[in-house]
């Protein structure tokens, strides 16, 4: 089914054609505050809470769904925040095309599609290849936050992180069932109200780590990039 396209006219919305490669986000925000990325912003509940609590940081919220981007922009306008921008773009394409290496202070990925069927596991966004790529774009000491309502996905991500030199766990356990002070999206709150669990991961790029692997392979534009068994 083709999603009805909403023309987004909000000043919070960034269009690809308005950006250089890599983009100058200091110019976009009008300052050089640390840049934080949220992958999969949904309707914008999480990033609105996060940006409100840390106005000294800039936030780029992305999603592949036009409707979600529009709702996020509307929510930001209501909150009158100035430190958030929204893009409709696929995460891997954003990293390769518009972000400079070591440009991100933090990345948040909350409850991405778990693709629970065994034959679809290779479609998960957060796999070993993606985490290796992400390491290039995190600043030394840059943080990675991941959450999932599917325990198997969270533990798979932990296993991938343990295989990659350069990440270090910031929690006393590999996967936590609670994280003090962590904003909860509407989806998370609804899930918890049903008596289910959210599984949290918090790693960072080791400040002493130098990325010695080859630069990430180019990613072609699109909201459904090619999947392969080699993606992890």
UniProtKB/Swiss-Prot annotation:
It comes from the Bacteria. One of its GO terms (cellular component) is tRNA methyltransferase complex. Coiled coil: none annotated. Signal peptide: none annotated. The keyword Cell inner membrane does not apply. It catalyses: guanosine(46) in tRNA + S-adenosyl-L-methionine = N(7)-methylguanosine(46) in tRNA + S-adenosyl-L-homocysteine. Keywords: Methyltransferase, S-adenosyl-L-methionine, Transferase, tRNA processing. S-adenosyl-L-methionine binds at residues 38, 63, 90, 113. The keyword Glycosyltransferase does not apply. InterPro entries: SAM-dependent_MTases_sf (IPR029063), tRNA_(Gua-N-7)_MeTrfase_Trmb (IPR003358), tRNA_methyltr_TrmB_bact (IPR055361). Its EC number is 2.1.1.33. Pathway: tRNA modification; N(7)-methylguanine-tRNA biosynthesis. The active site is at residue 113. Substrate binds at residues 117, 149. Pfam families: Methyltransf_4. One of its GO terms (molecular function) is tRNA (guanine(46)-N7)-methyltransferase activity. Belongs to the class I-like SAM-binding methyltransferase superfamily. TrmB family. PANTHER family: 3-DEOXY-D-MANNO-OCTULOSONIC-ACID TRANSFERASE/TRNA GUANINE-N 7 - -METHYLTRANSFERASE, PENTACOTRIPEPTIDE-REPEAT REGION OF PRORP DOMAIN-CONTAINING PROTEIN. Catalyzes the formation of N(7)-methylguanine at position 46 (m7G46) in tRNA. This is tRNA (guanine-N(7)-)-methyltransferase. It comes from Syntrophotalea carbinolica (strain DSM 2380 / NBRC 103641 / GraBd1).
């Amino acid at each position: 089914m083709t999603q009805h396209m909403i023309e987004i006219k909000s000043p919070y919305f960034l269009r690809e054609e308005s950006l250089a490669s890599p983009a100058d986000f200091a110019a976009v925000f009008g300052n050089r505050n640390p840049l934080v990325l949220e992958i999969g912003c949904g309707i914008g509940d999480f990033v609105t809470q996060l940006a409100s609590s840390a106005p000294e940081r800039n936030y780029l919220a992305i999603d592949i769904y036009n409707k979600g981007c529009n709702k996020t922009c509307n929510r930001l306008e209501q909150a009158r925040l100035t430190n958030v921008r929204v893009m409709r773009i696929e995460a891997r394409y954003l990293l390769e095309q518009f972000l400079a290496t070591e440009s991100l202070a933090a990345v948040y990925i909350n409850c991405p599609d778990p693709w629970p069927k065994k034959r679809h596991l290779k479609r998960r966004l957060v796999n070993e290849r993606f985490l290796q790529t992400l390491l290039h774009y995190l600043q030394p000491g840059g943080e990675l936050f991941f959450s999932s309502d599917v325990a198997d996905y969270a533990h798979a991500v932990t296993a991938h992180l343990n295989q990659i030199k350069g990440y270090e766990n910031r929690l006393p356990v590999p996967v936590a069932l609670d994280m003090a002070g962590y904003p909860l999206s509407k989806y998370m709150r609804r899930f918890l109200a049903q008596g289910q669990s959210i599984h949290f991961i918090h790693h960072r790029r080791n400040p002493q780590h130098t990325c010695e692997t080859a630069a990430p392979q180019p990613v072609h534009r699109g909201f459904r990039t090619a999947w392969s068994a080699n993606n992890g």
